């Protein structure tokens, strides 16, 4: 066990010219070392982020037309019921109890966590490491996702549960089979290790990627969402993933849009409307 009393003497001094994230990292090490050094902390962080980000949109769905943001609802004629929300939430809880927690225990026995570093990452290290991990994961999941939609057996066995609902909602983000959840979890853990990301980078990336995943499934095309704020249509967002649930052979990438554009699987509302008009004319 790493002696926390030694941290005080190992911590680098922080100054205006030093790493701007060092004071935050010092605080986490000194005040919350027991929590952040636990092998269960990443799971707690990811699952609590899923809950926190999903609740506001669950409230919007319950309010329906009364909600001020209902005008941004993509499929206004399809609304999740409380029963659907509870079912998808239970799927997430079940998968974590049956698959994730035992996997964490086994991994910690086979490969214990190394001591946390005393030096914080630079802002550039956090940005470049986080972006790199997102791009790698986006590529992995795009290929995995496309293969599972192309192969009927894989689709039925692994991925079909996620398409139980044509109109996605926040809680359905983790409505996954155990196999899919463990695959996604494996990539989410191994990619930052291969890229040598700092733990603070990994945790920040975890929260941000969970937000992006939930935002993909909220069923609302909000004008202030990342998909609209990031220029050149680089991100997919809620509209792109909603279209995937309506047209499953399109928009396979989880976050970015470049792979779908390269492979010709990118579908937008405008393209869909154009295709429908052409069919009507024909």
Curated annotation (Swiss-Prot):
Q: Does the keyword ATP-binding apply?
A: no
Question: InterPro entries recorded for this chain?
Answer: Fatty_acid_hydroxylase, Sterol_Desaturase_Related
| MF-aspect GO terms | C-4 methylsterol oxidase activity; iron ion binding; steroid hydroxylase activity
Q: How does it sit in the membrane?
A: Multi-pass membrane protein
Note the coiled coil stretches, chain numbering. Answer: none
* Listed cofactors: Fe cation
The superkingdom of the source organism is Eukaryota
Domain Fatty acid hydroxylase residues, every copy: 133-265
Q: Which family does it belong to?
A: Belongs to the sterol desaturase family.
* Name listed for the protein in its UniProt record: Cholesterol 25-hydroxylase-like protein 1, member 1
Native species: Danio rerio
What is the primary gene name for this protein? ch25hl1.1
């Amino acid at each position: 066990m790493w002696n926390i009393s030694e941290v005080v003497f190992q911590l680098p001094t922080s100054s205006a010219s030093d790493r701007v994230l060092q004071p935050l990292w010092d605080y986490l090490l000194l005040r919350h070392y027991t929590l952040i050094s636990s092998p269960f902390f990443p799971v707690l962080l990811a699952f609590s982020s899923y809950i926190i980000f999903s609740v506001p949109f669950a409230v919007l769905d319950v309010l329906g037309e009364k909600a001020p943001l209902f005008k941004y609802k993509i499929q206004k004629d399809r609304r999740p019921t409380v029963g659907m929300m509870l079912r998808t939430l239970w799927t997430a809880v079940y998968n974590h109890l049956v698959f994730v927690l035992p996997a964490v225990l086994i991994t910690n026995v086979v490969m214990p966590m190394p001591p946390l570093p005393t030096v914080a990452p630079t802002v550039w290290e956090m940005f470049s490491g986080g972006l790199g991990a997102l791009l790698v994961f986006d590529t992995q999941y795009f290929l995995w996702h496309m293969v599972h939609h192309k192969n009927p057996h894989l689709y039925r066995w692994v991925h079909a549960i996620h398409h139980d609902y044509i109109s996605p909602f926040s809680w359905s983000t983790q409505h996954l089979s155990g196999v899919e959840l463990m695959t996604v979890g494996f990539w989410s853990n191994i990619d930052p290790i291969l890229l040598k990301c700092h733990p603070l980078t990994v945790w920040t990336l975890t929260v941000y990627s969970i937000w992006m995943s939930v935002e993909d499934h909220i069923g609302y095309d909000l004008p202030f969402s990342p998909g609209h704020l990031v220029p050149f249509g680089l991100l997919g967002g809620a509209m792109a993933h909603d279209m995937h649930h309506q047209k499953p052979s399109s928009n396979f990438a989880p976050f970015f849009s470049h792979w779908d554009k390269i492979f010709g699987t990118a579908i937008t509302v405008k393209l869909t409307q154009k295709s429908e008009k052409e069919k009507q004319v024909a």
